[in-house]
Structure formats: structure tokens, C-alpha cells
């Protein structure tokens, strides 16, 4: 039975994390560093991504007190551009001298308009980033692994509880449909790539009390109370509360039979 005791160590593994400057990504990257993974940090702004890499290195040495910090690299990448994505992923493999075994796609965004007034350009951009971007990074990740016959890889696509339900009071039709697409994309890829032993799952957060949410609330206590009134735990989540779920989904020893899953981590919001 000892060979079935799961481990969350990722020593020697390479993980690509998109949206690496975001609040959720920051928590997940810190978790991956703590468990030994090398990390390629991808975001749309090279300068900001390089600055975040320096912050993560400082965290690893001063907070985690690691004597040997996992290797990191920062890359500018617009995930809505397929050609760019494939070029950046190829460069990552060249720089690290190995193919990534794990992909965490956190890149994406949200904006709200009433459905009848939703600008077409805004809608198209969000679908390209949130949904097609998830497809493009998954393709660029899996294709060389399939070609080389490397097994045991894993993908976590960040969806949202808004891909499973329509949460009041936001007018976010395109965000909702893009995240619903991400959930079904993960299921479809899981089925297509099971024969290559590449697992694909979606993690679907509830409300996260981070910079973006704070900006939306902007001191509006009524809006805040309205949001948490639908959460059985009566609070929003913190980014760090998603680390364990993502490490589980990435771990081949812990989650070898978990693929195509849509994991809701929402404080019970969708249970009511």
C-alpha cells in the first residue's frame, strides 16, 4: 500500500503558469515553489513578469528558506494569439532543457455589460482570451509531449463557478459562457488525451477576496453583503485556499485517476 500514499512533491518537474502576475497565480506559484517545481512564469507584460519572478525568488529564500530555489523564468505571452503561445512554449522548453509536465492556466479576465448592450469587440476579445486562450495553451503544452511519448502530464484550467451557475447580481454573460466553455474544454481534452496519459481538469473558484474583487466592491458594503449572503461559509475565499486543490489535481500520485473533473471550490455557493 505504500506506493499508493500520495506525494505532492514536484522536484525536477517543470510547470508553466499563465497569468503569473495575478493574485491567484501568485498563491499557486508560491505553493509550487514550496513543493519543488521549476516554474515558467507567463504573462502579457514582460517587465512586470520579471519583477514578479524576483518577488517569488525572494519569497523562496526568505519565507520558505530554501537553500536551493527551483529554477524560474519569465516570459511575455498573449494567450489569445496561437502563434505566440506556441513560440513561447517552445522557448520555455529550450531554456529549461526539458518539456513541462504541468500547466496551470490562470490567465483571463472579467468585465460586465448588460447582455443587450454587450459590445461585440469586447465579447470577441473575452472569448479569445478566456476560452480560446485556454485551448491554445493546452495545445502548445500537449503536442510536444504526445510527439515525444512522455506520459504522466497534467493540466489545470481555471474556470469559475460562473461557468456552472448564473450568479446574481453581475451582468457578465460573456464571462459566464467563456468559463462554461473552459469547463467543457477540460472535459473534452481529458477524453481525447487520456490515451496519452495526459490528465486535464478544471478548477472553478468562487468569490476570491483579492485586488480585483476589492476594486469592484470599492467600499460598497451593500454589494459585499449581497455577495456573501449566498455563500454558506459567509465569507469570500483567499487565493491561498486554492493551493491544495491545484497541487492535488497536478499530482500524478495523488490524482492519477482524476481527469475531466470540474472541481468547484466556492465555499458551498453552488450547493444552495
Swiss-Prot record:
Conditions for induction: Strongly expressed during growth on L-arabinose.
One GO biological process term: L-arabinose catabolic process
Residues reported in the UniProt entry to bind NADP(+): 24, 78, 175, 179, 208
Transmembrane segments: none
Entry annotated with the keyword Oxidoreductase: yes
A single MF term (Gene Ontology): L-xylulose reductase (NADH) activity
EC number: 1.1.1.15, 1.1.1.250
Listed PANTHER family: BENZIL REDUCTASE, DEHYDROGENASE ARBD, PUTATIVE-RELATED
Protein's recorded name: NADH-dependent L-xylulose reductase
Provenance organism: Ambrosiozyma monospora
Gene (name only): ALX1
